[in-house]
Amino acid sequence: MAPPPLPLFSPSLKAPPPPPWLHGSSTQSRDSAPPVPPLPAEATPSKFRIDSPKPAPARKNTKTAAKPLTAGVPGGRTHRAVLGIIRRVRSLELSDAPSPNSVHTSNSGAAAAAFHLTIELSPPREPGQYVVEKEKSRAVPWAAARDEGLKVALRREKKPREPTRAETELETHELRRLRRLARGIGRWARAKKAGVTDEVVKEVRREWASGEELAAVRIVEPLRRSMDRAREILEIKTGGLVVWTKGDMHFVYRGSKYQQNAKHSHTFLTNVHKDDAFQENDQSICGQKDEEPVKGTLYEREVNRLLDTLGPRFVDWWWDTPLPVDADLLPEFVPGSKTPYRLCPPGVRPTLADEELTYLRKLARLLPTHFALGRNTRLQGLAAAILKLWEKSLIAKIAVKIGIQNTNNEQMAWNLKHLTGGTVILRNKDFIILYRGKDFLPGGVAQTVIQREAQVHDEQVKEEEARLKAVDSLQMVGELSEESSLGTFREYQGFHAKFVHENTENSNTMIELEAEKYRLEKELKDHEWKLSVLNKKIERSNQALAKLHSSWSPSEQSADREHLTEEEKIMFRRIGRKMDGLVLLGRRGIFDGVIEEIHQHWKHKEVVKVITKQNQTRQIMYAASLLEVETGGILIAVEKLTTSHAIILYRGKNYRRPAKSSFSNLLTKREALRRSIEVQRRGSMKYFVRERQKSILELKRKLRYVTRQIRYRTP
């Protein structure tokens, strides 16, 4: 249970007396304390000061006003919660009983180091005394400075940047000299979409051979997305050091030990050492590298170890590590390769449902890329690597290389699907994602299942041979009678008369007619069922429209109408045609918002022009008459425009703006939209009902014709 509230202004157990100005003319306060002169209004805290009847206007800039420590935080703790925290902190401070020495020394200056929390408490009030508080007023002039010291700014901790190879290997003055030299370079090699290719490496070395210490390389998409990865690739392939990066430019230093006439080997472009191309994070159990820290998480090390077993890595990968396997370096043909054996578990549907497909696509988004592919055919080596990967992972994620000509992701996906038997769950210009399928069997399990099925087949063959031998060994109990027709010509004649028609052409025609009759009957039944479904939908739509129409009651036209002369109608018609302001009658039709907008136009103008996109004359005239009745105006004309019609309405000479702004007898905007959707839906369903009825009549006609043909050919 929390301790009772204690004053937080002093570390002593005895509460200090309240300020004398809070007790007014009390005798007890005069006896207990000497008279204190009243404080000026500027020094009196706003919490304790009685404001004048006309308070000063509040400042507009409330950002500089100091808030008390116990004020509620928007979206955080409330005032009561902060008070509870302070009580607990205060109880911890008072839990240790102070010794006499400590109390004595506290008066000499140690009390300044005690833990104090300033909190604004409501002062005690006497009967008849009231305090007028301002909501957004500062407490005292020094409150802002006092609260400023209590604020604690927690900055986001920045991740320390790892130094580059050039920063660790070169001296500081040498690095500065090279960067100053790089600012004057005007030529550069361009690493295109294919990345840092052999041509780029040759151009960099050609620049070094000409006597230059630095060579500039401009990086383009997609390698520009990760300039750190581009720097690593350049340092691996060229053997130099990237001393400076500016925008999309890398400046490569040839090194202090560069030999101009040395022959450089290009074998590392296809077989890069593992320590340079990617970091192998697993440690030796024997203890040779115990002093080196383990880099990367367990998942990253397992992924790297798995990809190492599949093939060489793709060094020009434009994303972060782990580097995918270069599928173009895998063998094109594998001897004895074939589509793997598959077997779906009993009671499991082999196809994927929509929810499963969505889940697999979301799962593939987080997985690293396993392969990078740049050719369309000869993918047997890649298929074998995918089958090996599927033993550890459900999904194989393949990236299509950028910058290689004649790549066709559709052909790649088709070949991989037929070589592996998997399911393509995603295919676009960047990625191909293959799911191993529910019927996938790992290599060892597949061989076991095949062997077991072969054993079962052999046992069945042996059982059949044994059964045939037993049947042959049995002797017939009775001989065939002389009157038997088995195997005789009479048996052949009876079979021919019973089952074979005399006219073969006629029998084939009858079979075709029977098949056509069966097809027509089935199709007619399907059409009738679909027609019944459409009729039920139309009935539900009619019920929804009836419910909407029940909440709408059109107004009655007034009997006392104004009459305009022909000259006035012609004048208002010209004015309406030249007007720029208009009211657009959309798909919702006429609802309360349209009537309100018309009255807003009539507030300043006598004529309003309403534009409607309807095509049928009956609908246009109905809308014009309904607007005339609901607004109380006078219909001047209905004009034909280029792609629409204009309805011109005059407000009348005795026009008065309606008292109420909402029209309860009309539909709201939301109800009008629902009505429009239901009307459009019902119209489309009626169209399909007519088309379905025509199809049913045509099928019945064909069925009658086929039935007559069968009846005519039947003997």
Swiss-Prot record:
Compartment(s) of residence: Plastid, Chloroplast stroma
Temperature curve summary: Optimum temperature is 25-30 degrees Celsius.
Region feature Disordered, mapped onto this chain: 1-76
Key words of the record: Chloroplast, Coiled coil, mRNA processing, mRNA splicing, Plastid, Repeat, Ribonucleoprotein, RNA-binding, Transit peptide, Translation regulation
Compositional bias (Pro residues): 1-21
Location (main, coarse): plastid
A biological-process GO annotation: mRNA processing
Summary of the function given for this chain in its UniProt record: Required for the splicing of group IIA introns in chloroplasts, and especially for atpF, by regulating the intron folding. Forms splicing particles with RNA. Also involved in chloroplast protein translation.
Name of the protein in its database record: Chloroplastic group IIA intron splicing facilitator CRS1, chloroplastic
Gene that specifies this protein: CRS1
